[in-house]
Amino acid sequence: MSESKIDNRLWSSKARNLSPYVPGEQPQHDDLCKLNTNENPFPPSPKVGEAITKVLAQQADDLRLYPAPESEELRGALAALYNLDINQVFVGNGSDEVLALVFASFFLKNRPVLAPDISYSFYPVYANTFGIELVQIPLEADFSISPDAYRRPCSGIIIANPNAPTGLLLSLADIRKLAGEHSDSVIVIDEAYIDFAQLEEASAESQMSAISLINEFDNLLVTQTFSKSRSLAGLRVGMAFGNASLIEALTRMKNSFNSYPLDKLAQAGATASVLDVEYFEQTCQQVIDLRTSLTAELTALGYDVLPSHANFVFARPHDGAASQVAEVLREQGIIVRHFDKPRINEYLRITIGTPSQHERLINALKALQAVADVEAS
């Protein structure tokens, strides 16, 4: 229903003034090649299904009881994985909920929060929802983030790393610089895609998660998600890592809205995913390999592809006609993401899919190029 037809006379002024986030398109048609929302092309660990089935088969009666409010088993597994104390780990109903709690817990109304101008589009929504001024810092000409541009008073900084939709990575040295220069502000590094960078060159410092810095900086908070690298977008589990005082603030805020954020099935499935390290590393590497091959194929077709460290590529057709390409692909049942925004409206964000999905995409692009060549001759 369009907003013009909705009776909003009983709404609060806050509800009237909201500009809600618009999620990525989720079409359900058969034979659709869906490469627009950065879902993992591989299924979750088989142990996830086994853990959930076990709960339903052996503990179904317990579903009448509330789940563990602090998700101790899952938080303990994450703490062990990253060599942290359990009080440095927070979990929530997807990283979007975790990020909303971050905005409510740390960012102030009398000092702005800083974020890149081209990044996750939920950040302005959170800021508007909580009445926080958001100052968007322009990316450099090559779409990189310059820490020097953030040298201004603020209550916090939030940066997606790797950034979306560009896929570019901010080095650990730059994150250390931001945290050190803003010791009285909370620095949030949103690592939804970090596992696709970290495993590519594990020995390179720039490939490492900022989790390795949280014992060095008490103002650094790192968020991650199970939706991307762990193939659990449908389960809705997110987490945050940081100094115990930051985690306590998130917990207090969470318990002021919903003291039971993760259900029993989500806790069981997510814990099983964390424990299956071999499967996790294997599928992440497969995505990285597919990203490399897709980048090469797109480059051969004349596309300008940014060096991605995520499970997607950001690619510009040689003539910049991204919207037209997206529309032609859609007509063939291939869905990619086009952003009608300045500076990036000539690019397509293409999720890393299966080999067969890539073949279908590349064949469609080759056919489109052949038609263009004939028309130009």
Swiss-Prot record:
Similarity comment text for this entry: Belongs to the class-II pyridoxal-phosphate-dependent aminotransferase family. Histidinol-phosphate aminotransferase subfamily.
Positions carrying N6-(pyridoxal phosphate)lysine: 228
Cofactors named for this entry: pyridoxal 5'-phosphate
HAMAP family in the record: HisC_aminotrans_2
Coiled coil (UniProt feature): none
Gene assigned in the entry: hisC2
KW Transferase (keyword) present: yes
Self-association and partners: Homodimer.
Protein's name in the database: Histidinol-phosphate aminotransferase 2
Molecular function in Gene Ontology: histidinol-phosphate transaminase activity; pyridoxal phosphate binding
Native source organism of the sequence: Psychrobacter arcticus (strain DSM 17307 / VKM B-2377 / 273-4)
Region (Disordered): 17-44
The entry's keywords: Amino-acid biosynthesis, Aminotransferase, Histidine biosynthesis, Pyridoxal phosphate, Transferase
